[in-house]
Amino acid sequence: MAVHFYDAAYDLEKALRNSDEYSRLRGLYDQVNADESAKRMFDNFRNVQLQLQQKQMSGEEITQEEVEQAQKTVALVQQHELISQLMEAEQRMSMLIGELNKIIMKPLEELYGSQQ
């Protein structure tokens, strides 16, 4: 029976890869990487994002200075049209995956009762 779950998961992965949402995300990501200035800006944004996430996950406090720097970085990348479109596409893909996760978790929520 477990093999069936993996087959379904791989089918879902294939469906995501073939979706319009993923195609748009991939296309925008490729465009950002092809533009040297946009790539540098986006890589810097991702590094700031990852550093803050790592600090948060390790229980370290994020300083006000780091918060302000992150806000400046976000404001800067949002001004770049291509990066802004990429971030919107990432958000749509993340929402789609979140909705799929809710569907997958539904049996456990029904079993244990929803906390929402």
UniProtKB/Swiss-Prot annotation:
Gene3D superfamilies: YheA/YmcA-like (1.20.1500.10). It comes from the Bacteria. Coiled coil: none annotated. SUPFAM superfamilies: YheA/YmcA-like (SSF158622). It holds the Pfam family Com_YlbF. Belongs to the UPF0342 family. This is UPF0342 protein RBAM_010030. It comes from Bacillus velezensis (strain DSM 23117 / BGSC 10A6 / LMG 26770 / FZB42) (Bacillus amyloliquefaciens subsp. plantarum).
